[in-house]
Every structure is written in structure tokens, then in C-alpha cells.
Curated annotation (Swiss-Prot):
Family matches, as CDD domains: S14_ClpP_2
Top-level taxon of the source organism: Bacteria
Organism lineage: Bacteria, Pseudomonadati, Pseudomonadota, Gammaproteobacteria, Methylococcales
PANTHER family: ATP-DEPENDENT CLP PROTEASE PROTEOLYTIC SUBUNIT (PTHR10381:SF70)
Family stated for the protein in its record: Belongs to the peptidase S14 family.
GO function terms (MF aspect): ATP-dependent peptidase activity; ATPase binding; serine-type endopeptidase activity
PROSITE patterns in alphabetical order: CLP_PROTEASE_HIS, CLP_PROTEASE_SER
Protein name: ATP-dependent Clp protease proteolytic subunit 1
UniProt-annotated catalytic positions: S106, H131
Keywords: Cytoplasm, Hydrolase, Protease, Serine protease
UniProt keyword Cell membrane, yes or no: no
The species this protein was found in: Methylococcus capsulatus (strain ATCC 33009 / NCIMB 11132 / Bath)
Length: 206
């Protein structure tokens, strides 16, 4: 069972396609993958990241010149898993268009902002949230110090990524991510996290 199936509670519709060779059944996510649509749903974690990365690489091999559409509805999750997806988005040749449906928080927001310039969207009632990475560690004082320094280094890295994709000064990013910072679509456009709020597909959708 893949992560999208698990996120849907194990209930995933099956669609039937008719062709000259007869009928063929697809789960809905596999059918949408044929249209170069990838769903990033739920917590960002290693298993989900591996599947998203595999789909990105597969679609690149299918057609390196055609856009990939990444639909995001995520509260965030592991920084390392999120950065693995982010790095792959930047690495592959096709543009990755991002679209927030529902929410894109924490690493979800960074992945939304990391889409191809001019191709980052959200739907009208989506919520987007940026903040600094969370961390907690117990152990010897020296180990706690090591982990504290790592969290600060990760925070700086994430802030630089957001500054790069939003065009905001790094100093403003540092202030704005100090606490949970929620935005609606229009605020996210003004901030530079996305390029447009889509009301309908006719308005220029992914």
C-alpha cells in the first residue's frame, strides 16, 4: 500500500480505461501519474519522500521536456525527507509546477515555494505556513550541544532556500519564520511563496 493510499485510509477509487485491447483498471493515483500529476499528501517522511522522488525520476525519464505537476496537501514533517524531495525537484530537467490544495505547512511550504518560477499555485482556501525547524534531544550535554548546533545550521539552510525562492531578504525570512507564520493565498503571492491563486482551471492551472 503506497503512502497516498495510506493517507486516504486505504480507500482509493479505481478507474476503468477502455482501449482497443480491452479494459484496464488503475488506482486513481496511478492514472493521474500518467498525466504527470504527483500527489504529496500527509506527513513528509522517508517512505513518502522515496516514492515522490521515484515518481519524479520516472516522469523525467518518460519525457524530460514536459512539466511535472506536484499537488501538495501536507502539514510538513522531516526536514531531511523534505530536502531530499526538494533537491530532486531542482535536479531533474522538467519544470516542477506546484499546487497547494488544503495546506502546505513547514516543509510542505518550502516544497511549494521550490516549484518552477512562475508555476507555483494554490487554490483559494489553501493555507500556507512557514516556521523554523523543530527539534528536541536528550542525552549528554556535549551531544545536546552538537544537536543544537545542527538545528541552527538546518534553520539557516532552510531560510536561505526560502530567501532564494521568494526574493525576500534573509533577515526578513529569519524574523518571519521565528514563530508559526500562517498565510492565505494572496498573502503568499505577495510574500513570493507562490505566483498565483487559482480559482478555476481556466485561470491557468497546472
Amino acid at each position: 500500500m503506497d503512502y497516498a493510499t495510506r493517507a486516504a485510509g486505504g480507500l482509493v477509487p479505481v478507474v476503468i480505461e477502455q482501449s482497443a485491447r480491452g479494459e484496464r483498471a488503475f488506482d486513481i493515483y496511478s492514472r493521474l501519474l500518467k498525466e504527470r500529476v504527483i500527489f504529496l499528501v500527509g506527513q513528509v517522511e522517508d517512505y513518502m519522500a522515496n516514492l515522490v522522488i521515484a515518481q519524479l525520476l520516472f516522469l523525467e525519464s518518460e519525457n524530460p521536456d514536459k512539466d511535472i505537476h506536484l499537488y501538495i496537501n501536507s502539514p510538513g514533517g522531516l526536514v531531511t525527507a523534505g530536502l531530499a524531495i526538494y533537491d530532486t525537484m531542482q535536479f531533474i530537467k522538467p519544470d516542477v509546477s506546484t499546487l497547494c490544495v488544503g495546506q502546505a505547512a513547514s516543509m510542505g511550504a518550502l516544497l511549494l515555494a521550490g516549484g518552477a518560477a512562475g508555476k507555483r499555485y494554490c487554490l483559494p482556501h489553501s493555507r500556507i505556513m512557514i516556521h523554523q525547524p523543530l527539534g528536541g534531544f536528550q542525552g549528554q550535554a556535549s551531544d545536546i550541544d552538537i544537536h543544537a548546533r545542527e538545528i541552527l545550521a538546518v534553520r539557516d539552510r532552510l531560510n536561505k532556500i526560502l530567501a532564494h525562492h521568494t526574493g525576500q531578504p534573509i533577515e526578513k525570512i529569519q524574523i518571519d519564520t521565528d514563530r508559526d507564520n500562517f498565510m492565505g493565498g494572496n498573502d503568499a503571492v505577495e510574500y513570493g511563496l507562490i505566483d498565483k491563486v487559482l480559482v478555476s482551471r481556466a485561470s491557468g492551472a497546472a
